């Protein structure tokens, strides 16, 4: 089943990449960044499937379509950690009730709504325009369908608003929304407590 998911994702990304290249051309600053399943050996294995959805890749000056940045933490332990990545790990360990550090990323999936690199601050109008394209709306829905998550975590309210727009306010997935993981005006403890409380409420439904 998982091998089929990976094949479906590859086919989807090829179509998606063609659509993006028609708009952005071959400019390396708009290289298409694949995402999805982080570790094919672990995703969904005796666990509920957790999907984090963010706005766009933050390339940090490196534009390479072969780089799935969050996956690199598993192969390059020296890679610099960020507040964003630390909180993705924190929420994942909290959700699975584990203490695996960054290895917990093997259990989850991760996707960006926009597949071309952004900067340190997302331009929301550009993001809305990107996601308003009818083909891309289908691609976003299709990727979520392939990943078939038991829970979606929206990384920021902008993500939630766009998803509700894409699904016409009829999302058939369990979904919670957290503050953007890079939001530094809240402590990690308060951030974790907020995530836990939302998980508890969602599990009661």
Range-by-range predicted roles:
Residues 47-52, 62-133, 198:
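Mobile, glycine- and charge-enriched loop segments
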Residues 1-84, 139, 143, 165-168, ...:
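Active-site and ligand/interface coordination hotspots across diverse enzymes
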Residues 1-20, 121-141, 159-205:
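C-terminal capping/extension of enzyme domains
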Residues 140-155:
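Proline-aspartate-enriched helix->loop->beta-strand connector
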Residues 55-60, 114-118, 157-161, 180-184:
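Short, solvent-exposed loop/turn segments at secondary-structure junctions
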Residues 48, 149-151, 170-175:
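A short helix->loop->beta-strand "cap" motif at the edges of active sites that frequently abuts
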């Amino acid at each position: 089943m998982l091998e089929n998911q990976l094949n479906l994702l590859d086919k989807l990304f090829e179509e998606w990449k063609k659509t993006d290249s028609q708009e952005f051309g071959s400019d390396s600053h708009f290289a298409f960044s694949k995402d999805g399943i982080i570790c094919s050996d672990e995703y969904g294995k005796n666990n509920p499937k957790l999907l984090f959805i963010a706005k766009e890749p933050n390339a940090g000056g490196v534009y390479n379509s072969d780089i799935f940045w969050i996956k690199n933490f598993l192969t390059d332990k020296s890679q610099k950690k960020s507040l964003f990545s630390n909180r993705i790990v924190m929420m994942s360990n909290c959700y699975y009730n584990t203490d695996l550090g960054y290895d917990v990323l093997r259990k989850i999936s991760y996707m960006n709504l926009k597949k071309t690199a952004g900067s340190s601050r997302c331009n929301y109008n550009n993001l809305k325009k990107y996601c308003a394209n009818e083909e891309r709306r289908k691609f976003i829905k299709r990727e979520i369908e392939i990943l078939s998550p038991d829970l979606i975590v929206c990384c920021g309210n902008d993500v939630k608003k766009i998803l509700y727009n894409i699904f016409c306010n009829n999302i058939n997935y369990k979904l919670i929304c957290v503050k953007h993981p890079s939001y530094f005006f809240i402590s990690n403890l308060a951030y974790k407590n907020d995530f836990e409380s939302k998980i508890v409420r969602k599990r009661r439904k």
